[in-house]
Structures are given as C-alpha cells and as structure tokens.
Amino acid sequence: MFDSPWLSVFPEASRITLPRECDIYAPGEASDLVFFIERGAVVEIRTDHLGTSHAVGLSGRGSLVGARLAATNTSNMSVRATTITETVVRSMHRSVFLHATLRNPDLASAYMTQLARRLEVARHLSEVCSSTRAGDHILGVLHTVADVCGADVNGNASIPVPSSLLERMTGTPQRIVDATLRELRTRGIVELERDAIRWVM
C-alpha cells in the first residue's frame, strides 16, 4: 500500500474494483460523490454539442475524481469519467469530504495541490488536442498517460490504454488512430496488444 493522506479519510468499506472502460460518472449526472483512486487510472472526456470529444482530465493512483470537480460547467458540453484500466476506488459524499478536508490544514493543502495538478494536466491535454496533426494528438495523449500514471507493474511500458477509448480521448477516427499506432510501433514508441496500446518507457 502506498502512503497517502486520503487513506485515513475515505472509508475502507467503500472500496470497490471497477473494470476498464467503466464510467465513474456520465454526462449530466448529478453525482455528489468524490472518488479516491487507490489503484488504476481514470480519464475525463468532454464531448461538445457537435459530438467532438477529447480528454480534459487524467488521474492516476492517489488522485481525487468527482463530477463536481469536472473541468467544465457549460451547458453545451458534457464530461464523462471512465476507467482506463482495472481501477480500485474509494468514495464518500462531497459534503463529508469537504468537512473532513477543510478542517485539517494538511488535508486542505493536499487538496489544493490536487486541484493545481488537475489544472496543469487539463491545460496540457488542451494543448495536445489542439494540434493540427492527428498523429500529434495520439502521441501527446499516450505520453501524458505515461507521465501521469507511470509504468505498469513490469516497469517497461505504461498502463494499457484501450484502443476504443483512445479514439474518444483524442477525437480521432479509428482508422487514423490505427494507422498512426502502426507507425509508432515501427519506431519503437508504443507496444500494441490485441485491443490496447502501451507507451514504451
């Protein structure tokens, strides 16, 4: 078990294991839960009124995720939080979380650090996804996953990103995703599995 100040806040009884590509919250869902990621990773994907999607948030082990922490409140956009790989989370009601956090200076400081990190990752993903080249979208998103979530247990590559999820994370058609990944594999940048991709560390 890794060391985190949130382990003493989120009840162990709330721990659940979620399969990959499982939604923690969906567009329009008025969830008041805050989730602590004990293991795994979650991506937040925004879809605008035209149906265009791209990643706006990425959280790994030790991070907090919640619908009320989403990066947008505008009515013409929606955010969905989805697990990238099998993920273990704990949860608690937002009001209980805020009460426990704000009365403890150490937790309040840790919470502000979390929010600052979320903003930094969101800004980086925005820059990556605004690239005019689709290949750069894919390269940038995979590199960000490796940077935020670190290596998988083998230490040689990042956690696996499902290919179907990568399409939504980048807003890139699957045929372009597939062609780009084949090129990246020949250059030794990624490893391709049956239905997932790993960034080579």
PLM regions and their residue ranges:
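A residue-level structural signature of the nucleotidyltransferase/glycosyltransferase Rossmann-like core
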Residues: 34, 56, 89-90, 158, ...
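Short alpha-helical segments that sit at the start of domains
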Residues: 124-148
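Cyclic nucleotide-binding regulatory domains
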Residues: 6, 22-85
